Amino acid sequence: MNQSHFFAHLSRLKLISRWPLMRNVRTENVSEHSLQVAFVAHALAVIKNRKFEGNLNTERIALLAMYHDASEVLTGDMPTPIKYYNAQIAHEYKKIEKIAQQKLIEMLPEELQQDYRMLLDDSYTSEEERAIVKQADALCAYLKCLEELSAGNAEFTLAKARLEKTLQLRHSSEMDYFMTVFVPSFSLSLDEISQDSPL
């Protein structure tokens, strides 16, 4: 049986810092970001199903979100202003991501490749699934801005404003629910979020 380097590569996502051009109070890596996006995407899917007549596979959504940035272990995390500077750069970067996704899939034993292709290759996801994961990704970036601003880091002021516009463009009922019910807590201190539920 041949060895596979797939999970050894994925373990290196923790070495890739996000927001590399910004001063951060606390550095965030791609691995922890992916887990937070999985939490939020799963929540959005549950909210959509329970409150807004959705019919999403919530576990699949969580897995898609968990792997949504996996290709960055080969490409690195390109800053958003560069990645989307114009349509041509965005298109070319998508092609690079696709190549990286395929390279990751090919690292797996052949008998496992199709299972992971369903998670890593965008062409196997529905428009609705992609939309939920993108909403969660944008929400998590927004939450990072709130955390940095709460810690006194004004560096994230413009990023927050840009992300507010992105969230308006990706607007949905489930996102509104999440923003109303869960997001305000991210601007509070540990004492403030703990006072209602002491151990």
Swiss-Prot record:
The record marks R18 as: Appears to be important in orienting the phosphate for catalysis. A divalent metal cation binds at H33, H68, D69, D137. It is found in: Cytoplasm. Keywords: Cytoplasm, Hydrolase, Metal-binding, Nucleotide-binding. It catalyses: a 2'-deoxyribonucleoside 5'-phosphate + H2O = a 2'-deoxyribonucleoside + phosphate. Its EC number is 3.1.3.89. The keyword Isomerase does not apply. Pfam families: YfbR-like (PF12917). It comes from the Bacteria. GO terms for cellular component: cytoplasm. Its main location: cytoplasm. It is an enzyme of class 3 (hydrolase). Substrate binds at R18, W19, H33, D69, D77, M78, P79, T80, D137. Its cofactor is a divalent metal cation. Catalyzes the strictly specific dephosphorylation of 2'-deoxyribonucleoside 5'-monophosphates. Belongs to the 5DNU family. This is 5'-deoxynucleotidase ECA3034. It comes from Pectobacterium atrosepticum (strain SCRI 1043 / ATCC BAA-672) (Erwinia carotovora subsp. atroseptica).
